[in-house]
């Protein structure tokens, strides 16, 4: 590991393509130039902050600078210099962006602690907080939220803390136990732990790449925002504000197949379509894979990924790619267990079967359930949902909600286009009759045309 610190800038530069190295050299020349435009051979923290301006929080600029400055140069006369040389600059960027897990771990370790002595978990936590905040900041600053506007001007602190906790939850200590919360903050972290963390948590390296590519405006062609943040297709004239923010979108997108990460199409929203189960059914059926998200009245945000189109029928549907998730107060995903195939359920207008939308578990005991009596649901898990091994997702086992969204993922395939253009009430007379008998209002009555049957 000691050798990694003294690898020459020339060797590190070989990890970049010639045109990339030229861009790295150009940025160094800008940073190291005096006010008169003369290159000095090194640059200071003040010069770096002046160049970055408002693109990154000052704390992250300082961490990047410290990481560069702590790379041991081959020229020992520069070892005590408090500025950054070309060799250190190139070596840091090369190892951080293109290095092995060991090399990336070393650069991250250099960025984490600025004090002598052992690095503790609280130092890693503070670094992770700065990293997550920097990603949210720079994507906002560079106007690369791709349509995911926040309900407030900034990403909510609760969302940032949930992302930080999720990243730290994958950190494993020498005794094999994972990070469990505040009681672990005084545990010592060695470089091997950081290397393993960087290896097992791809978001760490991904977020550092965003900070470098967008914060320093370096090697921008190497970073495609669509791989991180899907495009939000919800053109509602500025009226729509999603339950999700950019960090929760990044988290959920990372658990999807590549073809589902490019763009998300808003299919249904209570904000736009009202509290209507028939509206929900008519908007989400035959739309391909989708993501449904709810926020209960206690502020818990959770939902599920449906791997195929929803169909109104009294049988379970879907496959083992489906999963449940929570976003607030904590971020987590819950995959299939193999215990049963109760992945997805959508039914309406049946007198002998449950009417509503469900995922996981069994009839009347779903891991996630949205009742046809819209605005009510349950999440039952004692001790866990049999299908997804998920805990109770909502604050209360039986919950009330006002906010729900369903997103279609990727482009709508031809096999789904043209299907199910009718409302579920048009195609299911029994459902229509049952609704009228129960005295429930038909919110869409008079607001739409009933489509004609296709030949």
From Swiss-Prot:
| Region: Disordered, residue numbers | 435-455
Q: Kindly indicate whether the keyword Transmembrane belongs to this entry.
A: no
Q: Name one GO cellular component term.
A: membrane
Q: Which PROSITE patterns match?
A: TLDC (PS51886)
Q: What segments bear the compositional bias annotation Basic and acidic residues?
A: 442-455
Task of the protein = Activates an alternative mTOR signaling through RPS6KB2 activation and EIF4EBP1 repression to regulate cell proliferation and migration. Recruits MTOR at the lysosome, essential for MTOR signaling at the lysosome.
In Swiss-Prot or TrEMBL terms, this protein is called: MTOR-associated protein MEAK7
């Amino acid at each position: 590991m000691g050798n990694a610190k003294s690898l020459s800038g020339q060797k590190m530069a070989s990890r970049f393509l010639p045109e990339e190295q030229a861009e790295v050299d150009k940025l160094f020349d800008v940073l190291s130039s005096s006010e008169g435009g003369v290159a000095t051979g090194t640059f200071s923290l003040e010069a770096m902050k002046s160049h970055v301006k408002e693109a990154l929080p000052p704390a992250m600029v300082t961490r990047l600078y410290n990481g560069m400055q702590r790379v041991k140069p081959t020229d020992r006369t520069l070892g005590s210099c408090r500025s950054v040389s070309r060799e250190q600059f190139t070596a840091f960027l090369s190892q951080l962006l293109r290095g092995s897990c060991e090399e990336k771990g070393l650069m991250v370790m250099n960025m984490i602690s600025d004090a002598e002595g052992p690095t503790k978990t609280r130092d890693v936590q503070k670094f992770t907080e700065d990293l997550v905040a920097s990603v949210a900041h720079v994507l906002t600053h560079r106007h690369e939220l791709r349509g995911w506007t926040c309900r407030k001007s900034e990403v909510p602190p609760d969302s940032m803390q949930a992302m930080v906790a999720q990243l730290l939850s994958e950190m494993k200590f020498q005794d094999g136990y994972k990070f469990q919360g505040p009681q672990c903050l005084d545990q010592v972290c060695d470089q091997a732990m950081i290397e393993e963390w960087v290896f097992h948590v791809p978001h760490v390296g991904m977020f550092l790449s965003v900070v470098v590519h967008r914060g320093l405006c370096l090697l921008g062609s190497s970073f495609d925002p669509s791989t991180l943040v899907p495009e939000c297709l919800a053109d509602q004239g500025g009226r729509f504000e999603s339950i999700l923010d950019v960090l929760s979108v990044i988290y959920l997108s990372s658990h999807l197949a590549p073809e589902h990460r490019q763009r998300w199409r808003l299919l249904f929203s209570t904000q736009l379509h009202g509290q209507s189960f028939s509206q929900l059914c008519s908007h989400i059926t035959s739309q391909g894979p989708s993501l449904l998200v709810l926020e209960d009245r206690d502020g818990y945000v959770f939902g599920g990924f449906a791997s195929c189109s929803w169909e109104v029928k009294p049988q379970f549907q879907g496959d083992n790619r489906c999963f449940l998730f929570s976003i607030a107060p904590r971020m987590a995903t819950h995959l299939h267990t193999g215990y049963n195939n109760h992945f997805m359920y959508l039914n309406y207008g049946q007198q002998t079967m449950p009417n509503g939308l469900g995922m996981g578990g069994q009839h009347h005991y779903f891991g996630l359930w949205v009742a046809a009596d819209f605005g009510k649901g349950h999440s039952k898990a004692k001790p866990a949902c049999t299908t997804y091994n998920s805990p109770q997702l909502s604050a209360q086992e039986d919950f009330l909600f006002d906010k729900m969204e369903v997103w279609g993922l990727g482009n709508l395939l031809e096999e789904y286009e043209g299907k199910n253009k009718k409302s579920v009430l048009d195609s299911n007379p029994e459902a229509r009759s049952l609704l009228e008998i129960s005295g429930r209002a038909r919110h869409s009555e008079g607001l739409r045309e009933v489509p004609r049957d296709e030949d």
